[in-house]
Amino acid sequence: MKHFIILFLLLFVTAGCEGRGYEDVVAFGDSNTRGSNWDYRDYPKAQQWVNILKTAERGNLDILNAGIGGQTTEDARLRFQTDVLDQKPKYLFIMFGTNDAAILTEGKPRVSKQRFRENLVYFIEESRKHGIKPILMTCIPIIEGNGKHHLFYYSRYQAAAFEPKGGARKWHNSYNDITRDVSKRLDVPLVDNWKHFIEADGGKATDEALIQSGLIDPSGNHMTPKGARIVYEGIQDGQILQR
């Protein structure tokens, strides 16, 4: 009788776990996915957007953070098989562009717009071949700054390189426009982080407004915990994981 009861309980627990239907999510991106600035800013790890999502979806979805700081779509393509396809998730968040758009030498971005588009399409098409549902995300706005006091974007990148392009903020958003276009053309759900951040700063899209919003840290291109909450809310409001 005792053995029968134990067997019954084991079967009950197993059936319950199967019924809950655990699903996997991979968050694939750069430092704003990884939360690379959390350590040196001393932000609470629980307030990274991926971790907020993990907490909210605990018991429903297992979520893997596959963000690596400093990476472009070209870098990410090299690890797409191991970090995404081999994980066999149901959903895939894709957030790149900040490093692709960076101009380091000779006035050229790290990844051209054409190649950036090709890489996004590759991620989407390969995901779908493996039964994975891709979700695109735009990158956050840039606080340009004036290059002084080791603050904001122009303290690390040359403002002159971005002047012909209308400034770093406009240039970065032009990569987001590619993400938006790919989302529309390939019918991929989109979390428009850029749009949500600008709405949260009052719709002004200026350095002053973005600084006052508290959404972006002193680097000028990394989010704060307050910004991470905006990303999470964009996912939840769009019911992205229920589609």
UniProtKB/Swiss-Prot annotation:
Domain of life: Bacteria
Residues with lipid group (N-palmitoyl cysteine): 17
Keyword Lipoprotein: yes
GO cellular component: a single term: plasma membrane
Residue stretches in coiled coil: none
GO molecular function: hydrolase activity, acting on ester bonds
PROSITE patterns tied to this protein: PROKAR_LIPOPROTEIN
Subcellular location: Cell membrane
Protein name (Swiss-Prot/TrEMBL): Uncharacterized lipoprotein YqeF
Species assigned in the record: Bacillus subtilis (strain 168)
Name of the encoding gene: yqeF
